[in-house]
Regions:
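Amphipathic terminal alpha-helices
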Residues: 6, 301-309, 313-332
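N-terminal Rossmann NAD(P)H-binding glycine-rich loop of SDR-like oxidoreductase domains
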Residues: 7-27
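NAD(P)H-binding glycine-rich loop region in Rossmannoid oxidoreductase-like domains
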Residues: 41, 47-92, 100, 120
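Conserved Rossmann-fold NAD(P)-dependent oxidoreductase catalytic core, especially the SDR/UDP-sugar
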Residues: 92, 96-140
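Active-site Tyr-X1-5-Lys
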Residues: 137-163
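Substrate-positioning beta->alpha
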Residues: 147-148, 176-181, 195-218, 227-228
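Conserved C-terminal active-site "lid" loop/helix of NAD(P)H-dependent oxidoreductases
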Residues: 206, 245, 268-313
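Mid/C-terminal beta-alpha module of Rossmann-like enzyme folds, strongest
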Residues: 219-285, 319, 323-326
Length: 332
């Protein structure tokens, strides 16, 4: 690969995708982006947009033509929605990217996955990539992302050099998902601690995750990382509810103190899921079995492999970055 690289970022207008795009631009690379809509602020910086569906292989082939690498970030996230949508976007979309890389001779693929692919309802404390994929899925997001990751691993047999990255709980400036939801629920009085409130989780600043994606490409070029999956994080777990309450305090909100036992929250989630499915209600249920479990259990992983192969390191101190972000949210 030359220094003047041409790369494709699927989902490049999203939270993580945009951070990757900005790093590629900073290196002087030619950047293409696929997505459902054009982002004018990126086109003015020279980004070439290809608007269309990720599951349309011909569309992805056109976008990938002449590229030297693809960062496949696009996905349907969330814990609720039509199963067919998760299949089409997360599985079908990933297969389209793989097929496009093969057809257009793109040698390198960095796939954004998730630790949810190993979800089994239990706590993880320092677990590594030897963990098997989950089986008893509680949401289609985790199930379809696991299948997508399997397909990426299988694709290396045909000569594609690829790896999958599993960042846990991505957050940071411009986060459109996690923090806005937490703040909205806190303001409405609907936020509760699930479980005993002492569970530890990994968190990943968006800059840490974006840096790791570019490092993964360099690792593939250097002959490392091919066929591998890597957990990503800041490298030190945090107590989830301490983290959330520090965010709330910095944003000028009261800390959450009300507790709901996990069995109660889990049963509530099952009931709400059934209600939403039966009556085909719009939006996500306010609680699901998957969310209840994630909010109450330990989820932190050994990132030694990413440190070794990708030179993973946090882009910012976790608590300092959280305080800065909370202050920005308070003044917004």
């Amino acid at each position: 690969m030359t220094n003047q690289r041409r790369v494709l970022v699927t989902g490049g207008g999203g939270f993580l995708g945009r951070a990757i795009v900005e790093r590629c631009l900073a290196r002087g690379w030619n950047v293409r982006v696929t997505g459902r809509r054009v982002h004018a602020d990126l086109t003015t910086r020279g980004v070439e947009f290809f608007a269309g569906e990720i599951s349309d292989c011909q569309h992805i082939r056109q976008a990938a033509r002449g590229c030297e690498a693809v960062f496949h970030v696009a996905a349907k996230a969330g814990v609720w929605g039509p199963r067919a949508d998760y299949e089409r976007i997360n599985v079908g979309g990933t297969q389209s990217v793989i097929d496009a890389c093969k057809a257009e001779g793109v040698p390198y693929l960095v796939h954004t996955s998730t630790p949810s692919v190993v979800f089994n309802g239990e706590s993880f404390r320092g677990a590594d990539e030897m963990l098997p994929y989950g089986r008893n899925w509680l949401c289609d997001y985790a199930r379809t992302k696991a299948e997508a990751e399997r397909r990426v691993r299988t694709a290396i047999v045909s000569g594609l050099r690829a790896c999958s990255l599993r960042p846990h709980l991505i957050w940071g400036p411009r986060d459109p998902h996690i923090f806005p939801r937490i703040l909205a629920r806190a303001r409405s009085g609907a936020l509760s601690i699930i479980g005993d409130g002492n569970n530890q989780v990994d968190v990943t600043h968006v800059d840490t995750a974006a840096d790791a994606h570019l490092s993964a490409l360099e690792a593939l070029i250097a002959g490392r990382a091919n066929g591998q999956a890597y957990f990503l994080s800041q490298g030190e777990p945090v107590r989830l509810w301490e983290f959330i309450n520090r965010l709330l305090k910095g944003a000028g909100l009261k800390p959450v103190t009300r507790r709901i036992p996990l069995p109660v929250a889990y049963a509530m989630g099952a009931t709400l899921e059934a209600t939403w499915a039966t009556f085909r209600l719009s939006g996500e249920p306010p609680m699901t079995r998957f969310v209840a479990t994630e909010l109450a259990k330990d989820h932190w992983f050994d990132v030694s492999a990413a440190r070794r192969d990708l030179q993973l390191r946090p882009a910012h101190d976790t608590w300092e970055a959280l305080d800065r972000l909370a202050a920005e949210l308070r003044s917004a």
